[in-house]
Amino acid sequence: MKRVLALIFMMVLAVSFSSCADSSQDVEVVPRLNEDVQTDEASLMPDTEKETEEQSMTEHYTTNTKIEDVINDPVFGDYGRLIFPVDSGYYGGSTLGNLSLTWYNYIDSDKTVEICNYMRNQAENGDTIFYDIYTEEEKAADPAKKDTGLFFFKGNPGTKFAIVNAGGGFAYVGAMHDSFPHALELSKMGYNAFALIYRPGAQTACEDLSRAIAFISRHTDELQVD
């Protein structure tokens, strides 16, 4: 009986030592894997993100900037009015810091400021950040089409693109909270992103999205998107 117990005890010790040896090997491997992952992530970082880290963005706007000052900033031309809801009845507040949007909560004022500064810097540097999707003739025939277009958040040249559509209950377009932030983050990842400003309404919204897709498809070379 004593021999049997001794044999069992020795077997348990052997298994324990084996487990410890395996665990120590795993601990040694993990740091190497982490090092490899970090190296790969650095090499795959989009060019636009590297440039963003290297170059600080000029802060033209702050949380105290009046919304109307952004809308009427000459650098945006006529499309400044489309940065915020066309129908002012769907947003409140007088500054970027206290902007509110109907049916939305938790609006990040810092993100609002970041987006407005990004747009201004891009436009000031000569980059096109807004594209009409309808011709002047089409807009003259249907004035509602004047309140449409694509805001472009540029990623790496030749990369895939996405169209981001904000909600608003088909009553208005809540882009500042519901599509601009997403488009900006996609561009930081290297993707080309478009935020569509469409005519509220289930049918007209779909028509504008269809037109936006057609517009991008016809101008892939000019836009440098895939």
Question: Can you describe what each PLM-predicted range is?
Answer:
Residues 20-146:
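N-terminal targeting or regulatory segments adjacent to alpha/beta-hydrolase or S9 domains
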Residues 169-171, 193, 215:
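Serine-hydrolase catalytic-loop signature spanning alpha/beta hydrolases and amidase-signature enzymes
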Residues 176-194:
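Short amphipathic alpha-helix adjacent to the substrate-entry channel of hydrolases
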Residues 215-226:
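Gly/Ser-rich "nucleophile elbow"/oxyanion-hole loop immediately N-terminal to the catalytic nucleophile
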Residues 159-168:
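Short beta-strand element of the alpha/beta-hydrolase
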Residues 3-22:
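Sec-dependent N-terminal signal peptides of Gram-positive bacterial secreted proteins and lipoproteins
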Residues 142-154, 160-161:
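A short loop-to-beta-strand scaffold at the N-terminal edge of the catalytic core in hydrolase folds
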Residues 168, 197-201:
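Short beta-to-alpha linker loops that shape the active-site pocket of alpha/beta-hydrolase fold enzymes
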